[in-house]
Amino acid sequence: MKSKKSKFITKDILKEAIIESFKKLNPKYMMKNPVMFVVEVGFFVTILLTIFPSIFGDKGHNLRVYNLIVTIILFITVLFANFAESVAEGRGKAQADALKKTRKDTIAKLIGKDGSIKTINANELKKGDVVLVENGDVIPNDGEVVDGVASVDESAITGESAPVMKEPGGDFASVTGGTKVVSDWLKVEITATPGESFLDKMINLVEGASRQKTPNEIALNTILVSLTLIFLIVLVALYPMATYTGVKIPMSTLIALLVCLIPTTIGGLLSAIGIAGMDRVTRFNVIAMSGKAVEACGDVDTMILDKTGTITYGNRLAADFITVGGADKQKLIDYSVMCSLKDDTPEGKSIVELGKQLGITIDTKKYESIEFEEFTAQTRMSGIKLENGTAVKKGAYDAIKKRVQELKGVIPKDLDEAVNKVAKLGGTPLVVCVDNKIYGVIYLKDTVKPGLVERFERLREIGIKTIMCTGDNPLTAATIAKEAGVDGFIAECKPEDKIEAIKKEQDEGKLVAMTGDGTNDAPALAQADVGLAMNSGTTAAKEAANMVDLDSDPTKVLEVVEIGKQLLITRGALTTFSIANDVAKYFAIIPAIFTIAIPKMQLMNIMHLSTPYSAILSALIFNAIIIPALIPIAMKGVKYRPMKSEALLLRNMIVFGFGGIIVPFVGIKIIDMIITPMVRILNLG
């Protein structure tokens, strides 16, 4: 899977992150992160203890120096946590700045009701206004093409250098504000008010201005706050108990113990993980309307996938004409081409092209005044009505069969055989009829995208079921489904069938993802837990979905699901690591506190740390430096491998649980060896 590659951190991002780290020290801001707020409060208390070492009756050699060292380490701990968040935000802001360059003061050519053109600022445009955009002009806002055909450079938004053809109707009518017309002209009806375009939404999202905490983040934050309160209560109770038993514990040591035991590591990285998850999605050219949408991707159980464009290339091209009922093949080709002359779909154009290759010549002027009936999901057929009243139709087997039967026509005995022949080849059969007589079948050939079997197998390994939706008959659907490797399929699928399929899965407690681009997909996109709309699709589809793919690649839903899973795994892994850290820090600090008054506590000093003060400072230093050490993992995410939930849990428990115990044991011991000479020189204690 490809994404926009960028440096992990640039000089500009680093400089901005350092400045922001200091700005975030404001207690009002720190209160948003209760765990780190407790650390900051501890920092202010130790400042007081540095100035007045005996304020709580504490005694000891060079206590002021010891308190000062604890103060500095606590300050650095808070600063590192702010730095982690600032780096994540900085990467988003850098991307936003690049996008802002495309959002200049654009001039719009507003077309009046009388056809006159008035030049106004793009900010004055309203929904429903129609503007003229000519070669070299920047499209002033999101809209739908109502007239004209032109090439549009979307590289400012999508990163794709190749221009995209835009024309009225179909999948290529939608245009995005900030993109540039590089040939011809377009008339565009504005569909977004200023400040609410996709460019504006994208800038707000990557800047983090509109980022709200997700339900999982809130739940985890609640657990972290609860743990912090528990340890705070324990420490408050420990002080009088220790005093009663004759153990003198300096207040700064108690604060150090509290900071080391509360989950500061994950507390300092939690916001960065969430922001980084959104950042990874945007680097795949997907706009997520919220962090909740990205998280939902990680919990998806079922994926509803359109066959065309997602599983197959969607370029169904006419490959053959098959006659039935003894019909003349020349007439079948004539009628097929005739009812496709005004069909602007790729299928319709390919039928006309194949007819030309077979020597058919039709006077197109003769049919200019004839009305064309477009294909719809309800009728599942298209065609024309000649001046003499004759109706020439092409469409799905069951739709044409029903029409012919209603007109008292006869169904050729070899029709089923012809349809099944095409279906078994994985093609789509289009049946052609003139009034109540069926002439034959058009074989539309499509190709399954390579590599899907392996990708669906990966999804199956992590418990995600895939269902293919297609308007094809059951035989064709079964052939394509088997070739692609999906778990199930819905043949002859209508828009309402997709909604029913989604509701059925949701009623079983499953989360569902789906892709779509048409207005008829909008209800299903809104119903799905994860709805990924194509940027080339209709405005209705994009408004209904909670994610939009700027590249208009339906297969990207597979990558988005993996990003969501990676986000959840990263958060879970680092939480496990953070809590496991406490075990090692417990064995470092507890013996150090009590070993002087209770010599037998020395047995708990399994790391053989040199002195009580070196043990406390070593644990505190490790607690601070582990935060920036884990920033790359928080930003890039834990490496994701498709596997069963049980195996994934076991792997992460071994790597981040057991590793979360071993790493601090080793780290604290190394730090202790480094700082012991300094502790002895300062004669702390």
From Swiss-Prot:
Organism superkingdom: Bacteria
GO MF entry, a single one: magnesium ion binding
Catalytic activity: K(+)(out) + ATP + H2O = K(+)(in) + ADP + phosphate + H(+)
SUPFAM superfamilies named in the record: Calcium ATPase, transduction domain A (SSF81653), Calcium ATPase, transmembrane domain M (SSF81665), HAD-like (SSF56784)
Cellular location(s): Cell membrane
Residues binding Mg(2+): D517, D521
Topology in the lipid bilayer: Multi-pass membrane protein
EC code(s) of this entry: 7.2.2.6
Active site as annotated: D306
GO cellular component, one term: plasma membrane
InterPro entries: ATPase_P-typ_cyto_dom_N (IPR023299), ATPase_P-typ_P_site (IPR018303), ATPase_P-typ_TM_dom_sf (IPR023298), ATPase_P-typ_transduc_dom_A_sf (IPR008250), HAD-like_sf (IPR036412), HAD_sf (IPR023214), P-type_ATPase_bsu_IA (IPR006391), P_typ_ATPase (IPR001757)
TM helices/strands, residue ranges: 36-56, 68-88, 218-238, 255-275, 587-607, 615-635, 654-674
Coiled-coil residue windows: none
Role of this protein: Part of the high-affinity ATP-driven potassium transport (or Kdp) system, which catalyzes the hydrolysis of ATP coupled with the electrogenic transport of potassium into the cytoplasm. This subunit is responsible for energy coupling to the transport system and for the release of the potassium ions to the cytoplasm.
Subunit structure: The system is composed of three essential subunits: KdpA, KdpB and KdpC.
NCBIfam families the UniProt entry points to: ATPase_P-type, kdpB
Family according to the record: Belongs to the cation transport ATPase (P-type) (TC 3.A.3) family. Type IA subfamily.
Protein name: Potassium-transporting ATPase ATP-binding subunit
Organism in which the protein naturally occurs: Clostridium acetobutylicum (strain ATCC 824 / DSM 792 / JCM 1419 / IAM 19013 / LMG 5710 / NBRC 13948 / NRRL B-527 / VKM B-1787 / 2291 / W)
